[in-house]
Amino acid sequence: MKSFHLVFTAFAIAVTTQAIGQAPKRPVPAQPKKQIVSKPVRLTPQPAKPQQATNPVPAAGTAAKPKSPPKPAIKSFPRKTQKLNFIGGDQVLLIGDGLVEQAQKQGYLEYRLMVHNSGKKLHFHNIGWSGDTPAGIARDGLGTRQAGHEPANEGWLQLRKQITDIKPTVAIIGYGMARSLDGSTLEQFKSDYQRLVEHIKGSAGKKNRLRLVFMSPIAHEDLGGKLPSGEAHNIVLEKYREVIGDLSKEHDAWFVDLYRYLKRRKGATTPLLTTDGIHLNEYGYWVMSSAAEFSLNLMATNFRFGIMNNGVERNGGYGIKLGNILPAAKGMTLDGQFDGLPPYFALEKKGKPFTQKTAIGRIQFMGLPEGRYTLVADNVEIHTADAKEWSGGAFIDAGPDVDQAEELRRLLVEKNDLFFHRSRPQNQAYLWGFRRHEQGNNFREVPMFDPLIRQKEEKIFALNKTAKRSYKLMPADDWEKIKPSETAKKSEAIAEAKPFKTQPLPRFDLGEGLEVNLFAQNPHLAKPIQMNFDAKGRLWVASSEVYPQILPGQMATDKVIILEDTNDDGQADKSTVFADNLLIPTGIEPGDGGVYVGQSTELLHLKDTDGDGVADDRRVVMSGFGTEDTHHILHTLRWGFDGRLYFNQSIYIRTHMETPHEVLRLESGGVWRLRPETLKAEIFLRGFCNPWGHHYDEFGQSFVTDGAGGQGLSYGVPGAMYFTYARAPRLLDSVSPGRYPKFCGLEIVRSSHFPDDWQGDAITCDF
């Protein structure tokens, strides 16, 4: 490294023993003796038969292999016989690790519990936290001190306060996965769990009796490839499951045995339930909600009915009340009202694997003449099929009740977003932390989320009811003639750009032989935070309108923008909004067929799967990153020469990351690295104030800049600890200490665009 140049630049059930592959089948009401009842149509897989040990006969001339000792059967926990009754006004606490935290983004669990309680005002408070334990270890960031300087029990104190403020009357607890991965003992987990339950009991609201629900962790799913199989981990998880099951009996709690209900059998062809083996995907959360519904003795809101060609309803129907059945020459009309909104699965592009598993119901029309028929409700198409399919029972997954169900779930997710910003706002260090006096009284904005949450809840309560529908079965050709014209599909809505004038270039003091050109000026570039080029020469930019923190009532509208120079004139002439509705994206790096984006608590991978230039696949790769200071959160994404993805965090951030291999915790600045194909992450470097620059020389050696502390440039030694790391026994000094500006960004020059004597030098910016 010859010299340093300072350059100013402008500028993301399975089959179980209870057969919960979807909502449990609605039982057929008891019938009088000798009454003819149609054979029930099962909406769920048949219950799995107990697996029997087999003793194959060895081939002639071969010795029988010694038998391995049989694996002991896991302990059985009979389902509680009482139904969990909710009471209007219940304050429902959802607390746990990443299992519970990610549930708020799907809304399926809350939705299932809501539709069973139409007319009751239930208030859900999800305070799940990735990497957390019953001791609240991940919550010390809610305190007032800098990361690494808080007392050892700060997380527990903050967890106690959160629970006390909510005053729960129903508590749903979902701990175990993080603890099973961090090397803790079962005895410590049980002790912490007992203490947590006792505090919940002591903090419970007095109006309604406290009801407890304990959820086990899910099983570690074997996804194949280079990910861990989970076999060894499941042995540990079974022990956590047993502890939680025993505690549920001790505390008279409902036990939701997710480990057993969601464990896929080896070789099963059912859809995958997780994204990485330990975190549920959308379908996994839908199945989880079915398991909870079953465990709480809540009858699933699926439906089924059958009608003869003479208009007589067949026995054995459930979930819907029918009336005014009038047969016609080709079809019939009838009225119907569901008992409750259906358990709709909202994943787009479901495909055949989900068709029957996630159907909300099944309808039979017997004795129809040959031909194709369409069923509509309130002039909304439900299903089109031929007479044979209708006679056998058509699976239903559409209609006005489905539309209403999805709207209700959407409102629940939006309410959860508001509560997240209220209970765990970004930029805590400046809201109530040790730097709260530096930016004015921003904390006054936090309670402003409360009325917004109440408004969203009132919409939820009003929508949570079924309506009587007018159904009509008619020839499909007749429907084609009268159905409402399909609204032309609109392109993705983009806010109209405000008129702007070309801005004059600022005056730069340039070195000899250098010039500055304007590459792009774009109204969507609100606050560009990081940018990186891909192999096609396109510039990917993470742009934020929300930074530094979301305001009450503000929507998360941040974007990933692709800028292209298609005619090689040195200026971008094409702009594409690749992704929006992001929350303060602070890091971006193209790769693996899409782009990695650091936003809020997550590292995302966004991908365009249909070739329209817009991301339609969004995957959470890692979560649990701290947000105590939004210019410290996950940033500086860059591919390493070793094929790993590197990314940084700054001094005030506390990260508690659950991976399929282990739980990783970093409560300080530092540099991470991740091998995406195995999801094996590690802390590469610890320390720094604001490590906003990281790059490699031609030998793959790392160099890191610091935006504070006068450290200049540091040589990255794997595993080393640097200035500010609070718990370091020894710190590695910078290679260029001195009174520098606050460095932001780092490039090591290997380009003919720069003079020969710059090659191999480091360039950076002033913050």
Q: What are these model-derived regions, one by one?
A:
Residues 1, 81, 85-88, 107-125, ...:
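Alpha-helical cap/lid subdomain in secreted, periplasmic
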Residues 7-15:
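Bacterial N-terminal signal peptides
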Residues 19-21:
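Boundary at the C-terminal end of the N-terminal hydrophobic targeting segment
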Residues 23-89, 158, 446-509:
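N-terminal pre-domain segments of enzymes
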Residues 70-72, 146-152, 232-233, 516-518, ...:
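Short, flexible loop segments at the rims of nucleotide/cofactor-binding pockets, characterized by
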Residues 91-93, 123, 538, 761:
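Residues that mark the start of a beta-strand
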Residues 478-767:
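Beta-propeller domains with acidic blade repeats across secreted/periplasmic ectodomains
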